[in-house]
């Protein structure tokens, strides 16, 4: 009877364990979240630390379905959709927690959300979301912010609840 080999855990330059997925394509996001066009508001996850945080991006184009009505002759991304974009990044974090794959989390509240500048066609929205707490395997609190060209666009706290 032989003793099983123990392989040391390898880490990447960010301290993530080898084999841990740190980026997600739009198809992989679609496999995790139920949102579809026109409400799929995250194009990629560019950094992911399991159980901690994620950074997602949304390329904002003139072809977005909300621009014709918001606002004619001066297209601006609605603030609620910026918050929804951050929430979808948070959804990726939650669906990657142990036992949460395939579960659906909905907004339970938002606090302290502030909008600092408009998001317009051609902008690349970078959303950073951090998991602050996850209680009773049902309620999550997250802090999120969205930036364009390094400038803060929006930030605030989001609460999520597991929907059975």
UniProtKB/Swiss-Prot annotation:
InterPro entries per the UniProt record, alphabetical: FabA_FabZ, FabZ, HotDog_dom_sf
Main location class: cytoplasm
The record lists the catalysed reaction(s) as: a (3R)-hydroxyacyl-[ACP] = a (2E)-enoyl-[ACP] + H2O
Sorted UniProt keywords = Cytoplasm, Lipid A biosynthesis, Lipid biosynthesis, Lipid metabolism, Lyase
Q: Which domain of life is it from?
A: Bacteria
Tell me which GO cellular component terms the UniProt record holds.
cytoplasm; membrane
Query: What GO molecular functions are on record for this protein?
Result: (3R)-hydroxyacyl-[acyl-carrier-protein] dehydratase activity
Q: Per its UniProt record, what Pfam families does this chain match?
A: FabA
Give me any GO biological process, just one.
fatty acid biosynthetic process
Asked if the Swiss-Prot or TrEMBL record annotates the protein with the keyword DNA repair, the reply is no
- Subcellular localization: Cytoplasm
PANTHER family from the xrefs?
3-HYDROXYACYL-[ACYL-CARRIER-PROTEIN] DEHYDRATASE
Role, per record = Involved in unsaturated fatty acids biosynthesis. Catalyzes the dehydration of short chain beta-hydroxyacyl-ACPs and long chain saturated and unsaturated beta-hydroxyacyl-ACPs.
Give the family this protein belongs to, as stated in its UniProt record.
Answer: Belongs to the thioester dehydratase family. FabZ subfamily.
Name the chain's protein.
3-hydroxyacyl-[acyl-carrier-protein] dehydratase FabZ
């Amino acid at each position: 009877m032989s003793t099983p080999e123990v392989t040391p855990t390898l880490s990447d330059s960010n301290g993530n364990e080898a084999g841990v997925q740190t980026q997600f394509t739009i198809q992989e996001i679609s496999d995790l979240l139920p949102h579809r066009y026109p409400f799929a508001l995250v194009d990629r996850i560019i950094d992911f630390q399991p159980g901690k945080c994620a950074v997602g991006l949304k390329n904002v184009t003139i072809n977005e379905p909300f621009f014709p009505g918001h606002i004619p002759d001066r297209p601006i991304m609605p603030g609620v959709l910026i918050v929804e974009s951050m929430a979808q990044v948070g959804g990726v974090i939650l669906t990657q927690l142990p036992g949460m794959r395939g579960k659906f989390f909905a907004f339970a509240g938002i606090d302290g959300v502030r909008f600092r500048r408009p998001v317009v066609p051609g902008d690349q929205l970078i959303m950073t979301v951090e998991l602050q707490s996850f209680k009773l395997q049902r309620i999550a609190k997250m802090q999120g912010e969205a930036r364009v060209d390094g400038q803060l666009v929006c930030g605030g706290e989001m609460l999520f609840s597991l929907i059975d």
